[in-house]
């Protein structure tokens, strides 16, 4: 418990850092001016200030909303408080997509929050793909250094033409740099911002072992501090209407600083539980954008030597420490 507290303090000391510009200076948009309800009827509720939204999943339906504009690059953020108690099978998603415009070759940049059985933590999954390349998954999964059901925490996506960075409470947790070999697999078409809650019983918790139990419904996810800071664009003409301030921010946010990278490395070494870059059972050769970090690779090999080390399952020793002990972030820093 002491080492977990130390990790919490360590991460919070640097939570004010955002690549290239100060997040606290970005304007917060109201629901009425920037978003439209996607589905869910009365399961979406906008609070009186117009700047906080409640999404509900019950026996009837989930719910969600989408930005009015498409964007070609930008910084997108929301403070989110996740449902508590038994949440197995529940998926809360905060993501960019253009699936409504490009049904067969759409792009996505995803934050997905995967519920769990009682007394087990929510897990966070990030993913990207372009041109409908869902067969080439680029997923990563993580635990968090806090309980996301107790209070609001900030989740952010920075998307430029050269890279994508995911943030949790302003701490960078993942960077994807565009490579020539990626081709159309890097998201490059205008996208809208989506926020949803829905029933993912078939896959979200332990591969579908545990589904949504509506005895615990309604499941309520709360959102505030919604930020859309980017270049709105006509999805057909793809000509951006980008103000100079947003354009300057994108130019300034091209690289993670050495200090930020150090904090990202701490997060990934302690709290990452899956990365496609190290999944030898899935990809014999890592994809072109993967930068192999020896510390990350070693930790994941210890966690699952079959998946991350390429060791045949019949060679595994039957006695191992529990998976939880390896992924809960309580190791010494």
Curated annotation (Swiss-Prot):
GO terms for molecular function: hydrolase activity, hydrolyzing O-glycosyl compounds; polysaccharide binding; xyloglucan:xyloglucosyl transferase activity. GO terms for cellular component: apoplast. Pfam families: Glyco_hydro_16, XET_C. Expressed in 7 day old seedlings, roots, hypocotyls, rosette leaves, internodes between nodes bearing axillary shoots, nodes bearing flowers, flower buds, anthers and siliques. Glycans are attached at residue 131. PROSITE patterns: GH16_2. Belongs to the glycosyl hydrolase 16 family. XTH group 3 subfamily. Catalyzes xyloglucan endohydrolysis (XEH) and/or endotransglycosylation (XET). Cleaves and religates xyloglucan polymers, an essential constituent of the primary cell wall, and thereby participates in cell wall construction of growing tissues. Required for cell wall modification during the development of tracheary elements. This is Probable xyloglucan endotransglucosylase/hydrolase protein 27. It comes from Arabidopsis thaliana (Mouse-ear cress).
């Amino acid at each position: 418990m002491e080492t977990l507290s130390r990790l919490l303090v360590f991460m919070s000391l640097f939570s004010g850092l955002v690549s290239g510009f100060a997040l606290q200076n970005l304007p917060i948009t109201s629901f009425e001016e920037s978003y439209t309800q996607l589905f869910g009827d009365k399961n979406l509720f906008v609070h009186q200030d117009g700047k906080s939204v409640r999404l509900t999943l019950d026996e009837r339906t989930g719910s969600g909303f989408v930005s009015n504009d498409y964007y070609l690059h930008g910084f997108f953020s929301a403070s989110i408080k996740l449902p508590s108690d038994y949440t197995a099978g529940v998926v809360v998603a905060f993501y960019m997509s253009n699936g409504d415009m490009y049904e067969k070759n759409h792009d996505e940049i995803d934050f997905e929050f995967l519920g769990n059985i009682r007394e087990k933590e929510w897990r966070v999954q990030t993913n990207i793909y372009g041109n409908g390349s869902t067969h080439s998954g680029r997923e990563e999964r993580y635990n968090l250094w806090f309980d996301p059901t107790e209070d609001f925490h900030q989740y952010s996506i920075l998307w430029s033409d050269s890279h994508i960075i995911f943030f949790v409470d302003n701490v960078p947790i993942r960077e994807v740099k565009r490579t020539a070999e990626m081709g159309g697999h890097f998201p490059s078409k205008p996208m809208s911002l989506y926020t949803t809650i829905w029933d993912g019983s078939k896959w979200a918790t332990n591969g579908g072992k545990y589904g949504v139990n509506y005895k615990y419904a309604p499941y309520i996810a709360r959102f505030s501090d919604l930020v859309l800071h980017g270049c709105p664009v006509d999805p057909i003409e793809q000509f951006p209407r980008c103000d100079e301030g947003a354009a300057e921010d994108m130019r300034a946010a091209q690289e993670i600083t050495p200090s930020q990278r150090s904090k990202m490395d701490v997060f990934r070494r302690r709290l990452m539980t899956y990365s496609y870059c190290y999944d030898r059972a899935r990809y014999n050769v890592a994809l072109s954008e993967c930068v192999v970090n020896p510390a990350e690779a070693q930790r994941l090999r210890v966690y699952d030597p079959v998946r991350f080390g390429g060791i045949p399952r019949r060679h595994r020793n039957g006695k191992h420490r529990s998976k939880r002990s390896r992924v809960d972030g309580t190791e010494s820093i």
